[in-house]
Amino acid sequence: MTVELPEGYRPSADEPFMNDMQKEFFRRKLVAWREELLHESAETLDNLKQGGMTVPDIFDRASAEADKALELRTRDRMRKVISKIDAALDRIEDGSYGYCEETGEPVGLERLIARPIATMTIEAQERHERMEKTYNDE
């Protein structure tokens, strides 16, 4: 089903939560973000391939290795975000997008606009992070 969005459309609290227009808005936002990350990832891969030259100076080599490690961490982070974007797109398809995976409550439009891969309300996310911190400190 294709939904036409008016130019400049932005989801509003005045309309039913996760109506077809809102779902299409977030679907487009997620797809565009995914494409941007894939493009950046391809550039990162090109940079890594070009960085395969032997550097004679030990300091230059250390710097090149540090750059390569940073590129690899960035690429890994992008891969994780792309995975979360794919999961969000799946939730749009199955109708669970925009609802907290812990409480079932709406995550909130402003939160989704700021972080379209959010899966929890702010309150549930804070509880989750407190629990994580408690168990990770042991």
Model-derived segments and their meaning:
Residues 110-114:
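Short Cys/His-rich "knuckle" micro-motifs
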Residues 97, 118:
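Residues immediately within or flanking Cys/His clusters that coordinate Zn2+
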Residues 1-94, 131-132, 137-138:
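Interaction interfaces in information-processing and related assembly proteins
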Residues 107-108, 129:
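Short functional micro-motifs and their immediate structural scaffolds
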Residues 100-103, 121:
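Short cysteine-rich clusters marking metal-coordination/redox-active sites
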Residues 121, 126-131:
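Membrane-interface alpha-helices
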